[in-house]
Amino acid sequence: MENAISTVPEFLPALPEILLAVGAMALLMYGVFRKDCDARETSLGALALFALVGAFLIIEPNAYVETFGGMFVIDGFTKFMKLLILLAAAAAIVMSLTFIRREGMDRFEYPVLIILATLGMFMMVSANGLISLYMGLELQSLSLYVIAAFHRDNTRATEAGLKYFVLGALASGMLLYGASLIYGFTGSVQFGSIATVLQADGTNIGVIFGIVFVLAGLAFKISAVPFHMWTPDVYEGAPTPVTAFFAGAPKVAAMALILRVLFVAFPSMESEWQQIIVFIAIASMVLGAFAAIGQSNIKRLMAYSSISHMGFAMVGLAAGTPEGVRGVLIYLVIYVVMNAGVFCCILAMQRKEGYVENISDLAGLSRNQPMVAFMMAMLMFSLAGVPPLAGFFGKFYVFMAAVEAGLYPLAVIGVLASVVGAFYYLRIVKIMYFDEAAEPFIQPMPGELTAVLGISGVFTLFFFVYPAPLILASQAAVRALLP
């Protein structure tokens, strides 16, 4: 008994993760034992669980705490990232309520899988060693593989799930190989110990190879070039609310992990990993911008858009400074909110025969549904980085960090990629406002989509009026990561 009491403090820092795990199991049992349980019931349970976990995270102190032998850490940075992940996951569940019922996916397991994926993301964000990193990554990935193929009767969804699984397994293998190299050359799996060893002994070629493989595995999770090949097919084939989830929360978790790995485990090797990050950032920005131009399916276009946006976020990471990390965090928040709004508009693209996904189907939307068209146009301008919308400030902070760090060519390439990207965003605005009206969509938009779209639109439009809370919160998170 005494032993059990002494272990209680070990578990307290991980209470949000424990709540998610217990909640997922409880909802799973509720769905199994209650006859005719549908996704709406378990979705409401999942949202209540997210609210409880979010409340705990908000009242939790910002102190730095390590537990489970130093493999699990909580601080102000993990709190910031976990709240953003919760926000993205909750939005994905809310956006899917009407869709899953209309598309014959109304099964109680759907929200449970999102909870389990969120649990994996929480573990990734709090990982303080290579083993806990891999555990969190795999828990997230296994849930996402199943969600991608959740619409069993749809061959595109099944194909998307299979592609994601095969390529995800390859990326996990690369990450694990890199982790084994790092462990072999440093003798430790804990980030702090790895940093200490490298500080004392200096760098060697084996550790550099290890970093390359670990970054390859993590770059896959944020769809960064050249590990982006799965993204367009999976985004197009997966059910639309699932695509909205993929485009938000997993990217936040993987970016948090990249930040912690590079700045906590390998600060002494900044000159080595900075070159890799600069290459990935340039390749992602340029390929994402040019590849999206020829797309006719709006979900494929959003896939290439997400590749490009992760490239922009990595510009701040490449700077290797506290200002750069702050820029990354602000960029991620703005990106997640804008993304949720765009996918609400995509989910409103429904006719009598079902959901449509072609960009040409938006023709004349301004005459049929002027409010939806206005919101979509505003979000497109924001994604393009037009001031004074939120998207402009996201890019401004990461480009300024790159300039202050002396990475002038990277900042210039980023600005040019933004100009190219503006073309395909503005093409959507042109189609909505100036093309001949197509057959109108079913009206009105479901209430839950209207709510998420409204929040996204207000944030995007009025962010410039009062950006201080987000800037201060991101600065506090950066101070926790880089004391």
From Swiss-Prot:
Protein transport in keyword set: no
Function statement: NDH-1 shuttles electrons from NADH, via FMN and iron-sulfur (Fe-S) centers, to quinones in the respiratory chain. The immediate electron acceptor for the enzyme in this species is believed to be ubiquinone. Couples the redox reaction to proton translocation (for every two electrons transferred, four hydrogen ions are translocated across the cytoplasmic membrane), and thus conserves the redox energy in a proton gradient.
Protein name (database record): NADH-quinone oxidoreductase subunit N
Self-association and partners: NDH-1 is composed of 14 different subunits. Subunits NuoA, H, J, K, L, M, N constitute the membrane sector of the complex.
Keyword Transmembrane: yes
Lineage: Bacteria, Pseudomonadati, Pseudomonadota, Alphaproteobacteria, Hyphomicrobiales
One GO cellular component term: plasma membrane
Naturally occurring in which organism (per UniProt): Parvibaculum lavamentivorans (strain DS-1 / DSM 13023 / NCIMB 13966)
Transmembrane spans: 13-33, 45-65, 80-100, 111-131, 165-185, 205-225, 244-264, 276-296, 301-321, 328-348, 373-393, 407-429, 452-472
UniProt-recorded Gene Ontology molecular function terms: NADH dehydrogenase (ubiquinone) activity; NADH:ubiquinone reductase (non-electrogenic) activity; quinone binding
The family this protein is said to belong to: Belongs to the complex I subunit 2 family.
Known catalytic reactions: a quinone + NADH + 5 H(+)(in) = a quinol + NAD(+) + 4 H(+)(out)
Membrane association type: Multi-pass membrane protein
EC number of this enzyme: 7.1.1.-
Gene name as annotated: nuoN
Protein origin, superkingdom: Bacteria
InterPro entries in alphabetical order: NADH-Q_OxRdtase_suN/2, ND/Mrp_TM
GO biological process, one term: ATP synthesis coupled electron transport
